[in-house]
Amino acid sequence: MSNPTSTPRADGFRMPAEWEPHEQTWMVWPERPDNWRNGGKPAQAAFAAVAKAIARFEPVTVCASAGQYENARARLDDGNIRVVEISSDDAWVRDTGPTFVIDDKGDVRGVDWGFNAWGGFEGGLYFPWQRDDQVARKILEIERRARYRTDDFVLEGGSIHVDGEGTLITTEECLLNHNRNPHLSQAEIERTLRDYLAVESIIWLPNGLYNDETDGHVDNFCCYARPGEVLLAWTDDQDDPNYLRCQAALRVLEESRDAKGRKLVVHKMPIPGPLYATQEECDGVDIVEGSQPRDPSIRLAGSYVNFLIVNGGIIAPSFDDPKDAEARAILQRVFPEHEVVMVPGREILLGGGNIHCITQQQPAPRKA
């Protein structure tokens, strides 16, 4: 497997949109007891449900530790799900796995961003994180795909969305946070994104969702549905701390033009809840120095925008919330050619994310 010293853009590669054909989806099996309650068993059931939902549409590969391999293999009893042994620190493969890039000659490669657990020693969620920083490399080794490594640039896959036609959406709250790349200016960060993802236009939303532990990942707040159309988490409640965030994002989106010069169509997606963990749920998480404490008074950053587009399907979270039905209807309207599958997302949310955060699509090779 080669490790090019050039950049994807220089080699003719680009990050494809999520709706472009997939070869498979990657996941990592949860077990960390200081993040997942009750030894991770409820989360494992939730991850298994997500994996099986995706497997209806495309192959799934789940990475499990040596200690959990047999358990994961038994619970993922589906012929379209492969389980491989990979050690990791936690289960957020959107952020620790590779960002795959493709060219028009049938090749697929991967970008291995630096990872510091969403902030390193200035707000990061756990330490150590070196096994998570190795996940992308291990996946690319398994797939025998060339790897572009950015040793001096930290980025999580959940902090970006692309339309496949030259436009990227992100948030200032995350990418400009001093705990990611304090040595780089905004212009230098943009240059890196252009070099490694082959985008032309970058739309900067001010913030992500309120109380998002990742410092406002865009994949929990706003995502592309197709070129020129986005879904935006939304509330009309002026007392909701998300209200001003939604308004500010909408202003930016309405004033922006994408790389093709198009104005954006914005589909508003209701925010569930407000949702909170129960005391019992918090008590089920181990207390370990250096990890994120759980508090039932802190609002959870629940979002229906945190879904995954797969081959012919939309895998989206439900929360046993009155807005679940409305979210499903919006997704079905926005994606009329896809089957919308809602999977319970509360257990994943309790750990700090949702379906998009725990998945990473690998695009299928394609030739022009």
From Swiss-Prot:
The enzyme's main class, written as a single word, is hydrolase
Q: Which reaction does it catalyse?
A: agmatine + H2O = N-carbamoylputrescine + NH4(+)
What are this entry's molecular-function GO terms? agmatine deiminase activity; protein-arginine deiminase activity
Q: Which SUPFAM superfamilies match?
A: Pentein
Tell me what induces its expression.
Answer: By agmatine and N-carbamoylputrescine.
Q: Where is the active site?
A: C357 (amidino-cysteine intermediate)
Q: What EC number is given for this enzyme?
A: 3.5.3.12
One of the Pfam families matching this protein, by short name: PAD_porph
Write down the superkingdom of origin: Bacteria
Protein's pathway: Amine and polyamine biosynthesis; putrescine biosynthesis via agmatine pathway; N-carbamoylputrescine from agmatine: step 1/1
Q: Which is a GO BP term held by this UniProt record?
A: putrescine biosynthetic process from arginine
Gene3D superfamilies (UniProt xref) = L-arginine/glycine Amidinotransferase, Chain A
Keyword annotations for this protein, in alphabetical order, are: Hydrolase, Polyamine biosynthesis
Q: How does it assemble?
A: Homodimer.
Report the function annotation for this chain: Mediates the hydrolysis of agmatine into N-carbamoylputrescine in the arginine decarboxylase (ADC) pathway of putrescine biosynthesis, a basic polyamine.
The family annotation for this protein states: Belongs to the agmatine deiminase family.
| Full protein name | Agmatine deiminase
Report the source organism.
Answer: Pseudomonas aeruginosa (strain ATCC 15692 / DSM 22644 / CIP 104116 / JCM 14847 / LMG 12228 / 1C / PRS 101 / PAO1)
